[in-house]
Swiss-Prot record:
One of its GO terms (molecular function) is GTP binding. Coiled coil: none annotated. The keyword Nucleotide-binding applies. It comes from Pyrobaculum islandicum (strain DSM 4184 / JCM 9189 / GEO3). Pfam families: DUF359 (PF04019). This is GTP-dependent dephospho-CoA kinase.
Length: 168
């Protein structure tokens, strides 16, 4: 069983790890495109409605994505039709439920949009742990930055955050 619940040190999860791009789209997407091209990134995983929408809008299609249909800015986001398959899961705030974990396992193998009933934020951690080599996980930071995590370089360090999660 793979289910995790945030139990302490929420502040560590709000930190802008490690490549924070403080630019608006389309420039922020161009920076990620440069990262992808320069370092041989083969898979892109996006977490968040606005991030996923911007990647599709500016022609840097993610391999898979996780969205929850909500944005901090209150914008209505249409369901992207780019993905081959959609998986719907329940994942409350501060959790990575077992069904969400299983959906991420499938998403790193195929072109999947995970539609979350609840909150998708913590799924970035599941993507970082499960993504294959030569991947980048990208999500929006609540203060406005685009966060890009090349998993080959940062997976081990960021997966230490699992120490602050309890199994559920």
């Amino acid at each position: 069983m793979t289910c995790f619940k945030l139990c302490c040190r929420r502040d560590l999860f709000a930190f802008p790890y490690p490549v924070a791009i403080w630019k608006e789209p389309p420039r922020s997407i161009e920076v990620v495109r440069d990262l992808v091209e320069s370092y041989g990134i083969e898979q892109i995983y996006t977490v968040g409605d606005i991030v996923t929408t911007n990647f599709l809008k500016y022609s840097l299609a993610p391999t898979s994505a996780a969205v929850d249909g909500k944005t901090r800015r209150g914008l209505k986001i249409d369901k992207p039709t780019f993905f081959r398959k959609t998986i719907e899961v329940y994942n409350p705030p501060g959790y990575i439920t077992e069904e969400a974990w299983i959906a991420v396992e499938e998403a790193v193998r195929d072109n999947v949009m995970i539609k979350v009933n609840g909150e998708e934020d913590m799924l970035s951690l599941a993507f970082i742990k499960l993504a294959p080599p030569h991947s980048v996980v990208v999500y929006g930071h609540y203060m406005g930055a685009l966060i890009a995590i090349p998993v080959d370089w940062y997976r081990d360090a960021i997966c230490k955050l699992f120490e602050y999660l309890e199994k559920c």
